[in-house]
C-alpha cells in the first residue's frame, strides 16, 4: 500500500525546484487570485527554515516590509508556487535562522557564500 502512495506522491512532485539552503535570498513567484483575475506576486527574502518531507516539503522566507518583519511559509511542490529563483547565496552555520527575528538592520545581515556548491 505504501508503494502506491509513494508513487503517486512522486508524480505530484515538481522537478524544476532549484537547490537552495537557509541563508539564501530567494524570490518566490506565487499565483494570487483576486476576484476573477489571476496574477503572479513576487515575495523576496531570506530563507530561514527548510522542512524536507518529500511532497510535503516547505520552506520559510522572511523579509522586512515597511520596517515590519514578514514571514511566509511556502509548500515547495504546491501548484500555487510558480517559480523559485535564488538571488544570492548566504553563508550560515545553522539550519534554522530563527535568531534573525530578534535582529534588525545591520545585525540581521548574512555574509555571502563565495563557493557555491
Curated annotation (Swiss-Prot):
User: Keywords on this record?
Assistant: Ribonucleoprotein, Ribosomal protein
One GO BP annotation of this record: translation
MF terms (GO), sorted A to Z: structural constituent of ribosome
Intrachain S-S bonds: none
Q: Which GO terms describe its cellular component?
A: cytosolic large ribosomal subunit
Is Iron there in the keyword field? no
Please name the SUPFAM superfamilies in this protein's record: Translation proteins SH3-like domain
Tell me which domain of life the UniProt entry assigns to the organism this sequence originates from: Bacteria
Q: Spell out the InterPro entries in the cross-references.
A: Ribosomal_bL19 (IPR001857), Ribosomal_bL19_CS (IPR018257), Ribosomal_bL19_sf (IPR038657), Translation_prot_SH3-like_sf (IPR008991)
Q: List, alphabetically, the Pfam families matched.
A: Ribosomal_L19 (PF01245)
This chain's function reads: This protein is located at the 30S-50S ribosomal subunit interface and may play a role in the structure and function of the aminoacyl-tRNA binding site.
Family of this protein = Belongs to the bacterial ribosomal protein bL19 family.
- Annotated protein name in UniProt: Large ribosomal subunit protein bL19
Amino acid at each position: 500500500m505504501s508503494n502506491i502512495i509513494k508513487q503517486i506522491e512522486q508524480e505530484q512532485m515538481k522537478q524544476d525546484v532549484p537547490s537552495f539552503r537557509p541563508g539564501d535570498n530567494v524570490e518566490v513567484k506565487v499565483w494570487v487570485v483576486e476576484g476573477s483575475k489571476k496574477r503572479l506576486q513576487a515575495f523576496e527574502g531570506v530563507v530561514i527554515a527548510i522542512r524536507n518531507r518529500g511532497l510535503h516539503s516547505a520552506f520559510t522566507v522572511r523579509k522586512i516590509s515597511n520596517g515590519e518583519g514578514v514571514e511566509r511559509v511556502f509548500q515547495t511542490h504546491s501548484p500555487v508556487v510558480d517559480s523559485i529563483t535564488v538571488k544570492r547565496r548566504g553563508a550560515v552555520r545553522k539550519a534554522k535562522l530563527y535568531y534573525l527575528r530578534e535582529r534588525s538592520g545591520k545585525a540581521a545581515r548574512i555574509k555571502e557564500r563565495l563557493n557555491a556548491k
